[in-house]
């Protein structure tokens, strides 16, 4: 992505966030939205969504410029310059994530084929994206998003709304829903059913494909889905490592990046071996772009936590950035006798009940990253989760000892 944008926009600083904290909050939020929209553009073959991703890239250009200017103006001593360099590295990591999202959006705009099996497999990821139309009888009609609290009641977050020919991206709590609105939502799989019910729709039956042979293309597609899961985990853990100044979590991010490199090499080798056997061969280009997308996100996450490996002090303002962004990181201890004590993640249905995604569990000195649904919670466990603030409140109440 070019680092230059229109000079008139660049120097009209009155339209820019006024301090480094505001800039970084917006960069974090915009980069995460771009990734969500990029995957949505692939899943639904939507050039409209892809164009919005490209438009958001221009916003990231301006924000990065503002971050650089603010860091230069804000550092008066060597110690301040070192802290600013760490924050600037985080900002550039967010911009790298947005670059990757823009690249994959351009794949859609250039009509580069994505295998249909790839689109069918994306709903099998750990965080799924769905599209649903609000029926006339739905209780969501005429409701404000802030009133219905979809993420904390279903686990699904609305990232876009199509209303007729128009799109509303990253809707806020004051967005009013209307009959016929098409919602693009992202969240855990167990949040799909309650969202469909709220929208007044019957959950469609999906052919599971039982008995169908799994060929090499299926395996390649599943590998890319795993790469998507790993890249999203890496970003969440990167911000967690910075928030809690954890070298253990930072090292996990570096390890995930190494694993991502291995997975991408495996996919590239598979493409070279299968190129003569698969028709149309153009569809393999789409797989390579998808793999590069996930790899770039994971690499950006690794660059974000590099400040911990190099012992660069992260100023306290960073905690405010994480706490004031759209998606926050939470650390919550499980108390004895609480609702969560002794339950598996599946039994607790944390995704649907709170809208929070569990990134890791700390038990004593051991970390369990990306815990499975059968992972059981016990007294003294520390949960690291990401989600919205109201979901954090619900998770906290579930972790407290019952009176």
Task: Give, region by region, the residue ranges found by the protein language model.
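Cytosolic, long alpha-helical scaffolding segments
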Residues: 1-403
């Amino acid at each position: 992505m070019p680092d230059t944008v229109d000079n008139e926009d660049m120097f009209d600083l009155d339209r820019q966030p006024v301090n480094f904290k505001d800039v970084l909050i917006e960069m974090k939020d915009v980069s995460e939205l771009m990734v969500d929209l990029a995957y949505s553009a692939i899943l639904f073959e939507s050039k409209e969504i892809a164009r919005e991703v490209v438009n958001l890239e221009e916003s990231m250009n301006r924000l990065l410029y503002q971050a650089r200017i603010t860091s230069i103006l804000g550092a008066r001593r060597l110690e301040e310059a070192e802290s600013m360099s760490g924050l600037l590295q985080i900002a550039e990591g967010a911009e790298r994530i947005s670059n990757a999202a823009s690249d994959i959006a351009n794949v859609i705009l250039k009509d580069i084929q994505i295998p249909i099996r790839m689109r069918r497999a994306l709903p099998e990821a750990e965080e799924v994206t769905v599209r649903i139309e609000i029926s006339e009888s739905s209780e969501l009609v005429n409701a404000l998003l802030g009133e219905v609290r979809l993420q904390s009641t279903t686990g699904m977050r609305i990232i876009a709304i199509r209303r007729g020919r128009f799109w509303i991206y990253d809707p806020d709590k004051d967005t009013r829903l209307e009959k016929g609105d098409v919602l693009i939502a992202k969240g855990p799989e167990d949040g799909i059913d309650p969202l469909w019910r709220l929208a007044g729709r019957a959950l469609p039956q999906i052919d599971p494909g039982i008995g169908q042979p799994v060929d090499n293309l299926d395996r390649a597609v599943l590998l890319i889905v795993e790469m998507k899961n790993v890249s999203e985990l890496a970003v969440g853990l990167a911000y967690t490592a910075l928030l809690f100044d954890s070298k253990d979590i930072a090292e996990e991010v570096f390890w995930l990046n190494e694993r991502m490199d291995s997975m991408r090499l495996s996919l590239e080798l598979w493409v070279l071996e299968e190129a003569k056997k698969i028709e149309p061969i153009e569809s393999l280009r789409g797989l390579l772009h998808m793999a590069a997308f996930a790899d770039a996100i994971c690499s950006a996450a690794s660059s974000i936590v590099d400040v911990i490996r190099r012992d660069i002090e992260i100023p306290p303002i960073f905690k405010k950035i994480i706490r004031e962004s759209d998606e926050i990181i939470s650390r919550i201890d499980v108390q004895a006798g609480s609702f969560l004590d002794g339950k598996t993640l599946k039994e607790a249905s944390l995704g649907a009940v709170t809208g929070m995604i569990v990134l890791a569990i700390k038990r004593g000195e051991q970390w369990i990253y990306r815990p499975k649904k059968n992972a059981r919670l016990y007294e003294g466990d520390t949960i690291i989760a990401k989600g919205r603030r109201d979901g954090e409140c619900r998770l906290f109440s579930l972790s407290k000892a019952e009176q």
